[in-house]
Amino acid sequence: MKQLIATHDGTFHADDVFGVAVLAAVFPDHEVIRTRDPERLSRADFVVDVGGTWEPAAGRFDHHQRGFTGARTRQDADGQVVRAEVYAAAGLVWAEHGRACVQQLAQSLGHRADDVLAARIAADLDDALVRYIDLIDNGAADVAPGIFGLSSQLALLNTGWLEERQLDAQALAALQLERFHEAMAVVHRALQRFVLRAIGQAVAAGDVRGAERVAQGRVLLLREGGMPWTRVVVEEMPEVMLVVFPESSRAQYQLRTVPAALGSFASRMDLPAAWAGLRDAQLAQVSGVPDAVFCHKNLFIAGARSLEGALRMAALALAR
């Protein structure tokens, strides 16, 4: 049965776009309306970011009403449960339907996410994206610099004065609904990519754990390029300093330092400072590895044309 999803009209923000996009993914047979008319809202199956009610079981997801107390909870350093980021519409919808959204998107991409995996992906996505949408909407954080944050990107799709001044009310409402659907498509695509990457990490995890280790266990050797390894190595392999793997085109083998923590730009170790920014013949001369290709100036990745060359570079880096 077609689900009627309602949100407010006028200017949209990331939280209402995101919430509606999530529901649209969970319920592919749907219609979206934008209104503040209480009578029309009352007929909707879901009402997002308008209506003055937070009642998930009834499909109501507003956060503007007086007395609203919805917030995430986290454990502090002492193990006590404390209030964290306050919900906006995006977080309210995600808390209720995030896992189902992940499973629906995974299925649409030809994969399966069981309840455990889907719950983990949903939690990761809330931590990486949804809570920031909520923070911005609630005025608790600034948008990303420039126009690169998702909230700013979606805001750019709103109609502007030059367009609005030429349209009557009916034409303007139609254009705003069209732009809202454009914004929903951006969110849907972003969710798809996040879910696909997360499933890839889950599928690859077993291969990463079983991969060969050399140099007394300090170098992990992956036989397939492009495999997501960072989370498993950072969280489960404290002794691994470097990861060696073929470039996706197999034109070279690369060695990469392991981040000190997930999301960190600091590494457990750096490559030799003398290699920084060198390429080809210069790097070969300085390193003593004939087929050395490059070393990034920030000393976190380097490469050679052969596996033997990359492993030799890894051994030299560890021997410093």
Show which residues each predicted segment covers.
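Gly/His-enriched, cation/cofactor- and phosphate-binding structural elements
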Residues: 202-320
